[in-house]
Amino acid sequence: MKRKKIAIVGSGFTGQGTALFAAARDLGDIVLVDLPARENYAKGVALDMMEAMPVYGSDTRLVGTSDYAEIAGADVVVITAGVPRKPGMSREDLVNTNAGIVKDVAEKVARYAPDSVIIVLTNPVDSMTYVALKASGFPKNRVIGQSGVLDTARFRTFLANAIGCSFQDVVGCVLGGHGDDMVPLVRYTSAGGIPVEKLLPKETIDAIVERTRKGGGEIVNLMGTSAGYAPGMALVEMIDAILNDRKRILPSIAYLEGEYGYTDMCLGVMTVLGGGGLEKVIELDLTDEEKVALDKGAQGVRNLIEMLKAGILAQ
């Protein structure tokens, strides 16, 4: 049986985390792609990880390269390449530089791995997913952004610590843009089947919601750069769902054509991920307050997309 193949563009912190977690699960062989100036680094990272596999018990083969021809036949291509956030920077500060990078990568993916599913992580990820979709020419089910799995994981972490329960018992839901305007939906969040509103006081939940929104910035302020392990694990959750056709209900950034009243934009919503990529958008019933919050985040994403449509996507 032919092994699955995963290509990861960008061998930085998040690319490494994604590769290591995917290799540990033996999801498929992995190609780490980076710039020519970083090719030896990517080769070294891949070799170091591969030498760990006999001890770990995985048969994953890894290679590092700067040659996009090496991604031929990839089932999933993850785009992590881009300029990382530094303290004081917003994701939006990165938009012009990273849009050029993502556009170039997506065009190469379309050339060398035309049947793959693209998962975008590069920030600001909602608008970068839109760039990848347009630059690749892929159908909307094969270009997905990662934000909600990570944001929900942070939400679950903070809630579980406050409740004093297992992380695994907390089921959460975060919609909207990947930034300060994301919308953690407390109504759809529970621990062991019990609504979290029955387990924690409102002020505690409100503080956790705010910490979740600032979760990425908290890591940046502590480490001086973006997170790597949690985003990598979130990506692997999505990769696994696609490669193994698991039909997982996961929050993902999807191209919307009328859902929630939004058109021609990419935004974090609940989705079904399986062998066909993003197979379905699940549209939740929202309260007026929740919809207003979602609209606020969507407008920020819309503004960036319109800027990109008038700029780099018009070239």
Curated annotation (Swiss-Prot):
CDD domains: LDH-like_MDH. It catalyses: (S)-malate + NAD(+) = oxaloacetate + NADH + H(+). Transmembrane segments: none annotated. GO terms for biological process: lactate metabolic process; tricarboxylic acid cycle. Keywords: NAD, Oxidoreductase, Tricarboxylic acid cycle. SUPFAM superfamilies: LDH C-terminal domain-like, NAD(P)-binding Rossmann-fold domains. Its EC number is 1.1.1.37. Pfam families: Ldh_1_C (PF02866), Ldh_1_N (PF00056). It is an enzyme of class 1 (oxidoreductase). GO terms for molecular function: L-lactate dehydrogenase activity; L-malate dehydrogenase (NAD+) activity. Disulfide bonds: none annotated. InterPro entries: L-lactate/malate_DH, Lactate/malate_DH_C, Lactate/malate_DH_N, Lactate_DH/Glyco_Ohase_4_C, Malate_DH_type3, NAD(P)-bd_dom_sf. Substrate binds at R85, R91, N123, R154. Belongs to the LDH/MDH superfamily. MDH type 3 family. This is Malate dehydrogenase. It comes from Symbiobacterium thermophilum (strain DSM 24528 / JCM 14929 / IAM 14863 / T).
